[in-house]
Every structure is written in C-alpha cells, then in structure tokens.
C-alpha cells in the first residue's frame, strides 16, 4: 500500500481521470419497472423533472475529470442514443474527449447478443483498446447518485489494487439483490458472493451487509487479460459480479472502496445518497424525495451540476380558470412548458410540457413529459407515462381494485399508467 501526501492527492486527482476511460453499462431493460421500460432502456427512463437516469453517471464522469466515455447499449436503445446525441455532443475530439456509443453488434465470432455485463465489455475490446487508457472505470447506467470517481481512482492506486469495487452498507433484508463482500482491516476483499440467498452481515453491524454498488476500477491491462480468459470459459456466465469479481477476490487482488469517501454531498453530515430505482415504488419515491423541503439528493449544487439535454421551453405557468380558481402547487417540481390551470398540485413531479386542466387535484404523482390531464381529474400515488392523455373526470389512486383492473398497481399501491393501457379502456391518446 502506497502512502500519499496531500499534494500528491491533488496531482493525482487531476492526472488519473485523464488516464482513464469510463464504460457505462446501459443495455439493461429494467423489467421490474414493468411497462415503463417497454419502449426504452432503463438508463433512458426520465427522472427528477428533466433528466434521464443515465445523466447521473455521465455527469459524475465529467465532474470527476473523466472526458473519455463509452456507453454500451443493447435493449431498446433508440431513445437512449437520441438523448446522448442531443445532450452529450459537446466534447472536443481534437482534445481526445468523447462519448462513444457501443451497441451490441453480433460480431462474426458468434451470434450472441451481450451474454452478461463482462461480455458487454469483451465484445467491444477492440474499440476500447484504442483508447489507450491506463485505468478503466466500469459503471452502471441506471443508478442515481453523485460520486467523484477521481477519489476512487486515487484509492485504487494508493492501495496497489488491480481491481477496486465501490461498496456501501445496505439493510440485510435487501442485500440479496446485491453482490455482498467481506473485507479485512486494509479493505482487501476476502470474500465475495453475488446475490446470496442468505447474505452475511457486517461484523460491526449485524443488521447490515456490505454490498457492491456495481462500480469498478481496473488496471486496464489486467482487465483485458481477465476478459479474454473469461471469454474462453464455456462455464462462465460472463458477468462481473458472478464470475470476475469472485475470481479476482480469490487471487487477493480486489479491494473495496467505501462509498462515503467519494460521495459528493452538500451536507457532510448527511447519509451518502445512492439509489437503485429498479422497482416502481423505488422510482416513484426517489422522484418525490426531490420535491421535499430538504431533499437527500442536492440537485442545486453548482459545484457538481447534473447535465442533460435542455430543450428550449417557456417557463412553467400557473393560471386561474374561467371560474376564477387559481392554479397552485406546493412541495413539487414543475418543469418548463407546463401549464396548471385552476388546479392543485401537491408533493408531485411534473416533467416538461405537462398540461393540467381545471378542477384537478394531483397528489404524490409523477407525470412524465407531455402528459395531458383533463378537467376534474384526481391523481394520487401514481406514475403517468409520457404523452398519456388522461380523460376528463378520471380518478387514479383511490380505489385499489379499480386501479388494478385498469392499470398496473404494485404491491405497495403505486399505480403505473401508460398510453397502451388507456387505449385498451377506449380512451383516445391523440390530441
């Protein structure tokens, strides 16, 4: 383990990102989000009033000083590709800055799409090697968080690791959804199990397990060697968590990086924020959390901006209807192009170009772009997919049986509404 002085840290914080390339795994469908991902990959799902989920990983790279990125796509990639082309095309290729789109290509070697997360990188090795990076940062494109990857790179170099895995404690009852690890006093990973049925607890806290966040730093040459070896293994599932990380752990070359060391927060005393919005409830709740008085995730931090494609839109407008009732909102996010006419919006998130007509009550709802809500509607505890036309007088979120019959209703009572569901009920979706 190498001990570094403060000046060395500052120098490495500038140099290491320039020697790195980030690969963002963005090909997943996200089946637990149900119909919300029928026509888009999970990283392309809207979030936080104006963003897409992938914007967080991309923004973290830019803010960390990493200016070379590859986005690996597969499932329903058109929306994602379009978003990146529109919103992330400001790089200067002459300065060796870029976002490369790396779709599944079914190369001549075989007819397989990506067989796993590791295989997604393997199938693009010929392209990735051209980047001539010393370090490769592997990221999931479907998580919400703010992290300074330069701090993780420094930790990787300081510990003399060949592979570093970002980790954080999670409640033990949720740990079966993650890779779970045990570490020694130097953060060397001594055991790693992917999605165990009975996850081991942390020695100092039996209520929690130490979980992998799916964020990795590799020495580039070591990663390429591992991937080529894994590609030849017919018994491998070609997945980082299931195959590569356990193998590296056995070799004694994997180290853990505690997420609090690189989590970017405005309040240093706050709990580190990282969310996998992979279920409808988690997605709904994470959106509504941003509308709270003091949200856990600070979206207004000028030192760590979240970038996205910014469409030219007029400001949101709140107007009275013909009867004189005023449009108003409380504890909500309302994006550009929205018009709220004589209705009440409480604890909700309205994306761009949403129109709420008179006499409506919107409570704890997430309305994606271009939703049109007819007069006298009541929407509660729901997610309304893009461009839905909610007919006059419709009530959602008040009658569990009625909601389950018409739409998708989660076990926690969150209702998902899509254009296809409304069409099946006989409601026209064209205006």
Swiss-Prot record:
Alpha-D-glucose 1-phosphate binds at residues 114, 179, 194-195, 212. Beta-D-fructose 1,6-bisphosphate binds at residues 39, 419-423, 429-431. Signal peptide: none annotated. CDD domains: ADP_Glucose_PP, LbH_G1P_AT_C. Allosterically activated by fructose-1,6-bisphosphate (F16BP) and inhibited by AMP. It catalyses: alpha-D-glucose 1-phosphate + ATP + H(+) = ADP-alpha-D-glucose + diphosphate. The record marks 74, 113 as: Could play a key role in the communication between the regulatory and the substrate sites. Pathway: Glycan biosynthesis; glycogen biosynthesis. One of its GO terms (molecular function) is ATP binding. AMP binds at residues 40, 46, 52, 130, 370, 386. Keywords: Allosteric enzyme, ATP-binding, Carbohydrate metabolism, Glycogen biosynthesis, Glycogen metabolism, Nucleotide-binding, Nucleotidyltransferase, Transferase. Its EC number is 2.7.7.27. GO terms for biological process: glycogen biosynthetic process. It holds the Pfam family NTP_transferase. PANTHER family: GLUCOSE-1-PHOSPHATE ADENYLYLTRANSFERASE, GLUCOSE-1-PHOSPHATE ADENYLYLTRANSFERASE-RELATED. Belongs to the bacterial/plant glucose-1-phosphate adenylyltransferase family. Homotetramer. Involved in the biosynthesis of ADP-glucose, a building block required for the elongation reactions to produce glycogen. Catalyzes the reaction between ATP and alpha-D-glucose 1-phosphate (G1P) to produce pyrophosphate and ADP-Glc. HAMAP family: GlgC. This is Glucose-1-phosphate adenylyltransferase. It comes from Shigella boydii serotype 18 (strain CDC 3083-94 / BS512). The gene is glgC.
């Amino acid at each position: 383990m190498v001990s570094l002085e403060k000046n060395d840290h500052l120098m490495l914080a500038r140099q290491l990102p320039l020697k790195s390339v980030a690969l963002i795994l963005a090909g997943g469908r996200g089946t637990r989000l149900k119909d919300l991902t029928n026509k888009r990959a999970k990283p392309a799902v809207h979030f936080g009033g104006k963003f897409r989920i992938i914007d967080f990983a991309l923004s973290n790279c830019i803010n960390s000083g990493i200016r070379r990125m590859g986005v690996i796509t597969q499932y329903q990639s058109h929306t994602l590709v379009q978003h990146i082309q529109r919103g992330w095309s400001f790089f200067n290729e002459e300065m060796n800055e870029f976002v490369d789109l790396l779709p599944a290509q079914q190369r001549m070697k075989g007819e397989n799409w990506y067989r796993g997360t590791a295989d997604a990188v393997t199938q693009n090795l010929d392209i990735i090697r051209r980047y001539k990076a010393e370090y490769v940062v592997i990221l999931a494109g479907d998580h919400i968080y703010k992290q300074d990857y330069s701090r993780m790179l420094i930790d990787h170099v300081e510990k003399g690791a060949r592979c570093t895995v970002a980790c954080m404690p999670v409640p033990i009852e949720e740990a079966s959804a993650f890779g779970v690890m045990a570490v020694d006093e130097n953060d060397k990973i001594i055991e790693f199990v992917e999605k165990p049925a009975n996850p081991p607890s942390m020695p100092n806290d039996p209520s929690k397990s130490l979980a992998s966040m799916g964020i990795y730093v590799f020495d580039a040459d070591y990663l390429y060697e591992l991937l080529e070896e894994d590609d030849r293994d017919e018994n491998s599932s070609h997945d980082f968590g299931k195959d590569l990380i356990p193998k590296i752990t056995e070799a004694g070359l994997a180290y853990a990086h505690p997420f609090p060391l690189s989590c970017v927060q405005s309040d240093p005393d706050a709990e580190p924020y990282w969310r996998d919005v992979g279920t409808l409830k988690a997605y709904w709740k994470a959106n509504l959390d941003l509308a709270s008085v003091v949200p856990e995730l600070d979206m207004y931090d000028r030192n760590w901006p979240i970038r996205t494609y910014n469409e030219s839109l007029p400001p949101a407008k709140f107007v009275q209807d013909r009867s004189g009732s005023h449009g108003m909102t409380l504890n909500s996010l309302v994006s550009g192009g929205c018009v709220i006419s004589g209705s009440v919006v409480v604890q909700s998130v309205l994306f761009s170009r949403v129109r709420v007509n008179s006499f409506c009550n919107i409570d704890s709802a997430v309305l994606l772009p271009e939703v049109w809500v007819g007069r006298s509607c009541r929407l509660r505890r729901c997610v309304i997919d893009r461009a839905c036309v909610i007919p006059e007088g419709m009530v959602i979120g008040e009658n569990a049986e009625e909601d389950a019959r018409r739409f998708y209703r989660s076990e926690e009572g969150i209702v998902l509404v899509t254009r296809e569901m409304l069409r099946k009920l006989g409601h026209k979706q064209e205006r």
